[in-house]
Amino acid sequence: MTLSDMSALLGCLIGGGMGFYAMLRPSWASQIVRLQATPGLVEGKSEFRGTYGGLFFFSHALAAYAIASGLEGAALGAAILGAGWFGAGVGRVISIFLDRAWTGLNAFNVGFESVLGALLAAPLIVSHL
């Protein structure tokens, strides 16, 4: 296993860990993304468990399995997840400028999403150097 594979596994652990915790504690996911479910409607809680929980956990878990098993295409799969994280950071930068949303939290999140994207994309990037 290469250093870039271990980097991607760390990214999977972080993203998947966040997803797993969001499935267990949707209120935590709500706080992290600064969104609230509509009071009195249970579908909002289901959305946090499903999207921020299940989607994040299972996509990162499968990428981790593929990397750890050395499956063909694992680097591309992890890089696709990385592109999603990087894209979230780009969208946040756009919001910082267009919406005048410069805050310490937004700055931190841009860095976090960019680093996580780089960790996940590392095997694909290294394989093409």
Labelled PLM ranges:
Residues 86-99:
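Transmembrane alpha-helical segments of integral membrane proteins
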